[in-house]
């Protein structure tokens, strides 16, 4: 009599060891009754780690604002301010864009924001990966096979000279693996990922602040280039007035040929200066387009109001103001979070020295059939379930764990040094930016006074020349000095505006970021 027997066996690989589990036979109907609850549990587990991307900014066009607290001797306070994705603006050639509109356009179009946004999303997804380490791993598998054999008979039986057999088997199974306890290693890994995600969000905010500053800087420079062109055009008008006065004196027989040639030379010089000013204006416009992230061939109007900023003295920031600025600068917050993440990596590396407790189990059923030519089919169904708890204790690994701990401590020390350097550099930038603003304010006042005196000198020299008292040389010199004073005043005013924007940038006040309190 031929017999066919199915013996179910599976192998689980857990923490480097192979665990063999033999099946405990159970009735098939009990196995079928357990399948729906198991499937329901699987769907519930799949929904446990699906929202980690919510840690990232919701849009590449707006800075990140989150609600989170990190406790580790120091506290990061965040405020929730949800933002929505804005539509990309269409360039209206008839509209004159002001600075706030240009900043919004840059946040929507500049590729740096989208790059930083994707990096923040990747860091947030990494947090989701670490959270999944706390959940069990359930694997479903189905193994099936078919076998056909033909055996020649020594004697013919009836019309059959061969014995043919067929058999097939189907074995579905569910395997469970769950790490129950690891002395805080997974928790340390998750905390490190959370800090890294926070640092990525701060870097995203830093990119936004830099873009805002770049737009303001290029906007002011473009406005200064426009003002220089206006000043140069005014110089051309003044030189033409001087030429008219020289020609009138020439007709009266008072002016010489040299005076007339000098007046014409002044006009030609003014025309050349106007061409140069126009080129500089176009270059400044392209720099603004680059900061906005729009094509170079874009046609748009930019509204730049006349210089009306009051040049009031600026007091240097107090130590308390500097501390507050450091507590809200994104780069300082990012380096601080990375330093905390590096410390958590030390805890994760040290946990490799400790044992781990895990749970493993399986649930399977088998369906087989055996056919012999000329005989009725033989079918059988088997089922089995298994569950066990195991402990792994690392004994020797050739010093690999010690090297990992030393490496983690080295990275932590390096991250701490980077944080201190970033904080010190930021404080130095704030002091330097305040000094630059003070110097620019003083230069602006002096340049404004210079323009007034140069204008009076030019008017007096021109009137004197018209009445035959002054000389053409004095008038030309006064006109050139007036243009120089006007350009210096434009540059000084622009430096004041850029210096003020730079001070706000280095103090982290371009957006509304989170603040870090208690940092030392």
Protein language model features and the residues they cover:
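Short flexible linkers and secondary-structure junctions
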Residues: 49-221, 357, 361, 399-402
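Periplasmic alpha-helical coiled-coil/stalk elements that build and connect Gram-negative outer-membrane
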Residues: 49-50, 206-324, 436, 440, ...
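Small/polar, glycine/serine/threonine/aspartate-rich low-complexity segments that form flexible
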Residues: 85-95, 141-175, 304-315, 347, ...
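Sec/SRP-type N-terminal targeting helices
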Residues: 114-115, 131, 166, 180-208, ...
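Terminal intrinsically disordered/low-complexity segments used for targeting and assembly
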Residues: 2, 21-27, 33-105, 155-156, ...
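Short segments within alpha-helical structural elements
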Residues: 269-294, 449-509
């Amino acid at each position: 009599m031929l017999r066919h027997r199915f013996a179910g066996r599976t192998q689980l690989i857990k923490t480097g060891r192979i665990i063999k589990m033999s099946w405990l036979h159970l009735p098939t109907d009990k196995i079928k009754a357990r399948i729906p609850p198991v499937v329901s549990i699987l769907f519930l587990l799949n929904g446990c780690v699906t929202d980690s991307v919510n840690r990232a900014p919701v849009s590449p066009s707006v800075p990140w604002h989150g609600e989170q607290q990190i406790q580790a001797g120091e506290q990061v306070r965040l405020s929730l301010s949800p933002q929505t994705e804005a539509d990309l603006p269409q360039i209206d050639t008839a509209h004159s864009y002001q600075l706030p509109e240009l900043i919004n356009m840059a946040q929507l179009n500049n590729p740096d924001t989208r790059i930083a946004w994707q990096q923040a999303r990747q860091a947030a997804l990494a947090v989701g990966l670490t959270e999944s380490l706390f959940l069990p791993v359930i694997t479903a598998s189905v193994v099936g096979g078919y076998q056909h054999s033909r055996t020649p008979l020594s004697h013919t039986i009836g019309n059959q000279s061969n014995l043919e057999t067929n058999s097939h088997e189907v074995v579905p199974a569910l395997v469970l693996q769950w790490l129950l306890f690891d002395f805080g290693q997974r928790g340390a890994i998750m905390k490190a990922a959370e800090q890294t995600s926070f640092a990525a969000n701060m870097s995203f905010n830093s990119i936004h602040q830099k873009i805002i500053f770049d737009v303001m800087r290029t906007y002011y420079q473009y406005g200064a280039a426009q003002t220089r062109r206006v000043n140069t055009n005014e110089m051309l008008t003044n030189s033409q007035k001087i030429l008219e006065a020289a020609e009138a004196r020439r007709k009266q027989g008072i002016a010489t040929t040299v005076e007339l040639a000098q007046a014409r030379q002044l006009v030609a010089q003014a025309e050349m200066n106007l061409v140069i000013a126009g080129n500089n204006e176009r270059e400044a416009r392209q720099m603004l387009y680059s900061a906005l992230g729009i094509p170079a061939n874009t046609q748009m109007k930019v509204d730049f109001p006349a210089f009306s900023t009051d040049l009031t003295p600026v007091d240097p920031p107090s130590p308390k103001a500097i501390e507050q600025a450091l507590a809200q600068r994104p780069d300082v917050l990012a380096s601080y979070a990375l330093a905390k993440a590096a410390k958590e990596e030390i805890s994760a590396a040290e946990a490799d020295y400790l044992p781990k407790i895990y749970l493993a189990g399986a649930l399977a059923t088998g369906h087989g059939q055996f056919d012999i030519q000329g005989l009725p089919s033989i079918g059988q169904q088997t089922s089995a379930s298994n569950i066990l708890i195991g402990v792994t204790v690392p004994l020797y690994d050739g010093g690999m764990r010690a090297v990992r701990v030393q490496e983690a401590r080295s990275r932590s020390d390096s991250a701490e040094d980077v944080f201190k350097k970033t904080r010190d550099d930021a404080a130095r930038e704030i002091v330097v930016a305040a000094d630059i603003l003070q110097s620019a304010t003083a230069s602006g006042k002096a340049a404004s006074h210079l323009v007034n005196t140069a204008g009076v000198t030019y008017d007096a020299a021109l009137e004197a020349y018209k009445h035959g008292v002054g000389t053409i040389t004095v008038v030309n010199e006064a006109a050139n000095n007036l243009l120089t004073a006007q350009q210096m005043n434009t540059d000084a005013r622009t430096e004041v505006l850029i210096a003020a924007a730079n001070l706000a940038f280095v103090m982290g006040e371009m957006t509304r970021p989170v603040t870090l309190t208690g940092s030392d």
